[in-house]
């Protein structure tokens, strides 16, 4: 049998291709789209629709809780490679969209004057075109009328361009372009039009009947006598299926595109179908950092040079105080560490001195040593103390007072009263001295059995004399 599975070179090439795909995917911009505060049902749905526009380079199932702060989101975004935040908020006046560039900013704040959800856009169309395969690739970004009106316009254009991966027009695969995001700037009203379209490429130069035959859904020709009626006159087609093409949407394809009749170097028409959402935006302000920096531009508030200098001085003072607190905290930590090390050295030195003192003093008692070891060094002193106690008191000392002396007395010293009494009994011999120990034991039992029992006290006698009846 032949070798099963892939060869070594195939496995290596496959692993290298997967690694290249992961690296290219990580290099692309990623985004988080979520709401903050009490946004409401419609604004939350708008955030989901905007998240739909940003697919697939966004977190489609992102859930941000009320207790999660913006710092938490920024901390999570770093390891995940997220580069942009799109945050929707709602106030009593209007709805706002914040576009943030991570990790250092800037932050663009837009006011959403008008918006329309995806479901409303789709329901208003007679024939909509939207399927899941369109969202497997990021949309094509088209910026219109972003001229040299000012630095804030250029910054807006750069921010929108960085939201999506760059495209090389010479190497791009046209089959990956299924959607288009159009952002149009109106210099007169200073508003942005946000539109999202579905892209479809169809061949031109064919009749309506031929286009119908090229579609996946075959037309109904039950009323026709011949196929020529469909190709020549287009009988049986509704007026809604008429889509006039012209020079405004006709182009020559540089490569073959998926679809019937879309051949290379042939004329085809590019058709756009809006899939939503729609938004009308107006730039409010531009800030440094992630939402808490200096205001670089404001559409309604204009500050003088003195006010800007005062704001800059206040910020520098705030940064100086922050640095001072950080330095003081670092000094406190260093001082505590030095105190801890000094205390540790002092404790170790004290332990060494105690051990040296214990080793040099033979009379010192070891607290962990057993009692036998404690008294082994001075048995003669305890014997003298016990003898002095006998002479002074006239009684034998307790065993707890002089344990070593008591132990020696039990082993080979003078006998006690009980032991002397046992030795003085007649016929009392030990087991090893030939005495009839068993006979003595039985005799003792028989004598105890013959002992006269004591009279039991009656109930009347046991009572007190004052309660007895006469």
UniProtKB/Swiss-Prot annotation:
Domain Brix, chain residue ranges per copy: 29-292
Modified residues annotated as Phosphoserine in this record: 238, 240, 362
Residue stretches spanning the membrane: none
Pfam families xref list: Brix
GO molecular function: rRNA binding
This protein's GO CC annotations: nucleolus; nucleus
Region annotation (Disordered) ranges: 240-264, 323-470
Record-annotated disulphide pairs: none
Protein name, per record: Suppressor of SWI4 1 homolog
PANTHER family with a match to the protein in the record: PETER PAN-RELATED, SUPPRESSOR OF SWI4 1 HOMOLOG
GO biological process, one term: rRNA processing
Keyword set includes Nucleus: yes
Role summary: May have a role in cell growth.
Keywords, alphabetical: Acetylation, Nucleus, Phosphoprotein
Source species: Mus musculus
Main subcellular location of this protein, as a coarse class: nucleus
Superkingdom field: Eukaryota
InterPro entries reported in the protein's UniProt record: Brix, PPAN-like
Basic residues bias: start-end ranges: 342-355, 447-457
N6-acetyllysine PTM sites in chain numbering: 441
Annotated localization: Nucleus, Nucleolus
């Amino acid at each position: 049998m032949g070798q099963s599975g892939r060869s070594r070179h195939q496995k290596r090439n496959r692993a290298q291709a997967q690694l290249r795909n992961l690296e290219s995917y990580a290099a692309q911009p990623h985004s988080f789209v979520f709401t903050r505060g009490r946004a409401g049902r419609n604004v939350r749905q708008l955030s989901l629709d905007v998240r739909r526009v940003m697919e697939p380079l966004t977190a489609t199932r992102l859930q941000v809780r009320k207790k999660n702060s913006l710092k938490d989101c920024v901390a999570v975004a770093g390891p995940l490679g997220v580069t942009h935040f799109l945050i929707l908020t709602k106030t009593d006046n209007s709805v706002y969209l914040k576009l943030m560039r991570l990790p250092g900013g800037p932050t663009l704040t837009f006011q959403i004057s008008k918006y329309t959800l995806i479901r409303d856009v789709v329901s208003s169309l007679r024939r909509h075109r939207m399927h899941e395969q369109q969202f497997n690739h990021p949309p094509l970004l088209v910026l219109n009328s972003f001229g040299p009106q000012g630095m804030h316009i250029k910054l807006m254009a750069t921010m929108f361009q960085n939201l999506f991966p760059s495209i090389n027009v010479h190497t791009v695969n046209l089959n990956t372009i299924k959607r288009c995001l159009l952002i149009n700037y109106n210099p007169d009203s200073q508003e942005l039009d946000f539109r999202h379209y579905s892209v479809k490429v169809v061949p031109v130069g064919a009749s309506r009947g031929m286009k119908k035959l090229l579609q996946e859904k075959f037309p109904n020709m039950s009323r026709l006598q011949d196929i020529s009626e469909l190709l020549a006159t287009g009988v049986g087609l509704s007026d809604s299926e008429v889509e006039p093409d012209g020079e405004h949407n006709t182009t020559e394809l540089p490569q073959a595109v998926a679809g019937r009749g879309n051949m290379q170097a042939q004329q085809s028409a590019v058709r756009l179908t809006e899939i939503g959402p729609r938004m009308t935006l107006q730039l409010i302000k531009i800030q440094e950092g992630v939402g808490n920096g200096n205001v670089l531009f404001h559409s309604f508030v204009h500050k003088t040079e003195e006010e800007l200098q005062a704001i800059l001085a206040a910020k520098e003072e705030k940064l100086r105080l922050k640095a001072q607190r950080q330095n003081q905290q670092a000094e406190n930590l260093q001082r505590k560490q030095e105190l801890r090390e000094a205390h540790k050295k002092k404790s170790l030195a004290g332990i060494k001195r105690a051990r040296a003192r214990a080793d040099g003093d033979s009379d010192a008692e070891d607290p962990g040593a057993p009692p036998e070891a404690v008294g082994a060094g001075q048995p003669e002193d305890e014997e003298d103390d016990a003898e002095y106690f006998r002479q002074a008191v006239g009684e034998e000392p307790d065993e707890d007072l002089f344990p070593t002396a008591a132990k020696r007395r039990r082993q080979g010293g003078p006998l006690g009263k009980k032991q002397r009494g046992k030795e003085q009994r007649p016929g009392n011999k030990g087991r090893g001295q030939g005495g009839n120990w068993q006979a003595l034991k039985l005799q003792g039992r028989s004598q105890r059995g013959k002992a006269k029992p004591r009279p039991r006290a009656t109930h009347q006698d046991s009572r007190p004399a004052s309660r007895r009846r006469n």
